[in-house]
């Protein structure tokens, strides 16, 4: 059997590669295309292996692994969440991911996922709103103006036509930065001085805060009939963004209940509180929005299938392009069983001055 060529090489997508791919595609186009992959995979939800992400919690944050497989491809993401990182000039969230071939176990792709996670989170939020928000929704309150905020705004614009954004953050500089970054994209933007002001007249409310504690970003009196709430900040036990009474008034939609009950807003509720899985709405097995008066809540914590979709999308996009580089990642001896022989040959090569 002839030897297969370049088995040691895995395509690697660096941060620079990912940025170039996004801007050359157009950020809004990228979000729309990525959303298509996510929705396609949600519609075949039952074909995936699914487990809650594997988390290692510490005093200051969490490190997680998020694996899944559809039987043909296997993907996982390494991701952290450390809210205090910004004080030392670091990102709150960083990530990378791998997509592999199930038959051989060989990696097909290694990619940065800090930027890609922000894109896939925003795309998933906007997909949910497509099914759960009122069809005439054009105004969104965006509470928490950190690293995720601009991505959320652009995804909602690209997928459902939101063009008015009401911003609020406890840090006015974050709001000012977000406003500057979004001005070129055609939004009508209002910087608000409180969360209460931000939600006035909003059709959709997105919360995307980072603090790792039980907070009340939204209180019950702030939520009127017909609103869709996009709760993005939940990602670990003990971290919530809204008052429990809001949950009791809302129809709640989730990605994967076993994970959301641990990490999402619904950790405040009884373990058997009824929720609807988003994939069932997409496939017509359950109903999303039933009336213009209904309050809907997407309790988003992020799930591995979204990362799988993102890696699959990027793999397809970079194939044959300049948006990746070859990475010598896998040992590839001439004889598969002679791994030690590789070391001996390398030793001999170095002795000869190579």
From Swiss-Prot:
Enzyme Commission number(s) from the entry: 4.3.1.12
Record field: temperature dependence: Optimum temperature is 25-35 degrees Celsius in the presence of L-arginine, and 38-42 degrees Celsius in the presence of 1 mM L-arginine.
**Notes on activation and inhibition:** Is subject to substrate inhibition. Is regulated by L-arginine, which stimulates enzymatic activity at 0.1-1 mM while inhibits activity at higher concentrations, and has pronounced effects on the optima for pH and temperature and on the Km for L-ornithine. Is not inhibited by L-proline.
Task: List the catalytic activities from the record.
Answer: L-ornithine = L-proline + NH4(+)
Which Gene3D superfamilies is this protein grouped with? Answer: NAD(P)-binding Rossmann-like Domain, ornithine cyclodeaminase, domain 1
The residues the record assigns to binding L-ornithine are 53, 77, 120, 235, 301
* Statement: the UniProt record of this protein carries the keyword NAD: yes
GO BP of this protein: L-proline biosynthetic process
Q: Give one GO term, molecular function aspect.
A: ornithine cyclodeaminase activity
InterPro entries the UniProt entry points to: NAD(P)-bd_dom_sf (IPR036291), ODC_Mu_crystall (IPR003462), ODC_N (IPR023401)
This chain's function reads:
Catalyzes the conversion of L-ornithine into L-proline with release of ammonia. Is involved in the utilization of nopaline, a catabolic pathway that proceeds through L-arginine and L-ornithine to L-proline. Nopaline is a predominant opine in plant cells transformed with Ti plasmid pTiC58.
Q: What is this protein called?
A: Ornithine cyclodeaminase
